[in-house]
Amino acid sequence: MSTRRAVGMFILTMLAAALGRCTDMLNSLGIMVIYLLWDNPMVLGYAGFVFSVGAILAIGIVTPLMSEPKGEKFWASVSIQLPMLPVVAMNYYELPLFAVFVNLIVIPALPVVFISGLLASAAGCFGVMPGKLLVFPAFAVLKLYEVLCGLVMKLPGASVITGAPDGYRIFLFYAVMSGFLVAFSLKKRAIECGLKEKGQILYSVQRVVCTAVLIAILLVKPKTAAQLDILDVGQGDGIFYRFESGTCIFIDGGSSDRKQLGENVIMLFLKYNGIQGISYWFVSHADSDHISGLSEVIDSGYTIEHIVVAEAAAKEEAMEELLFKAKEAGIDICLMSKGDSIEINDASGLRSTANEEADGIMCLYPGPADTALDRNDMCLVLKLTDGRFSGIFGGDISSEVEKKLVNEYGDELSVDFYKANHHGSRYSSSADWIEALSPRWAAVSCAAENRYGHPADEAMDRLMDAKCRVFYTMQSGQIKYKESAIYENNRQ
């Protein structure tokens, strides 16, 4: 799309020169935008079209008002990047803060790529070898771009997660920017009329303030309400919760049928919601359908402060591999046992005195002495409490463990929400367990087609008999609970 726009504008410029007429960038852009929209109105929702048109608009409108002889290249780069920040945030949910400096190297080398490409195209008519030789400078410059961008992205703070900006912030961004541009225009006229030294200093200050204010509009977000999300990960589990205090936790994060789950689902979800880091990432057990995505998230370098696992299961081979990778990434490891709790409000961390009244996470099972032949029965069982909301998350435990917990805790298990154990298996969600929990609603995380027969009709019938509303990721996609309302993506 950007190629069609660029070629069209180039043809218009050449045509104007041949006819002895003058043209300008914005008029040429307007003609090409009308043509492209006439050809296919749907390109308006295509990111490549928006980026291409937006960049030219920035060059034609913003650059003349923000650039000046002193620091011309730097402010030219800023003037192109700044108007595009909301577009970048809408499509990638993060901002590359060092892009301005990278462009100082990239933009001056663009003529090399352009000229080399044209010469190689012409030489290709006479043979492959001349074309290869002439295109080498373009290849070298593009390779340099790739290496440079890779190095920059490894720097601390190279990109900041903003989340998808809402319409209000986008409107505010461009309204404020328009105000600054009017001020820049007036100040430039004053400078040209002779108010040079004092006006020049004020003009420089205005540009810095403009840049800082516009970036702050995208970065600063109001406090949000508590939020629970059951991600659509196929045959697996992935649960996010944000406490009223703003602390974010994640439970599991894996799938047996979705490849690159961490990159394509979990990271996209976290970035879209503007989650800059996870304070506690709980791992129920080390089956791949619970940790495959987490492993990818660790590899990506995303901020995770603590990974929490059951102390009784920490020595399993698969768990040891995951924890080794986490330690290599600088993530703190917490071992949790029955009775331990993490209180969120006072950030007191892991402690061995259970306090059910405090907001946070309490471990119900397993204890140091618990053993089981099946790894599923050594899953971390957690009770979450946050104000008036509470939930139970039991991984893949069977009815045997459920029975043990009912006998030990009884009515203390009562919660609002229940994440169905073992993806709705017939061997979980027993009648006594559901009666003890008495949840208002439950979520089943599984794939529409799986070889395990999840969710089992027997287990779902037991939930329905208890007057519990049941939601399925295989039908609804991602399930969200926020401000006492349940939202579904409605995949079907």
Mark where each language-model region is.
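Hydrophobic alpha-helical transmembrane segments in multi-pass membrane proteins
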Residues: M1-V100, S116, G163-P222, A431, ...
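Internal helical hairpin/lid segments
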Residues: A109-G124
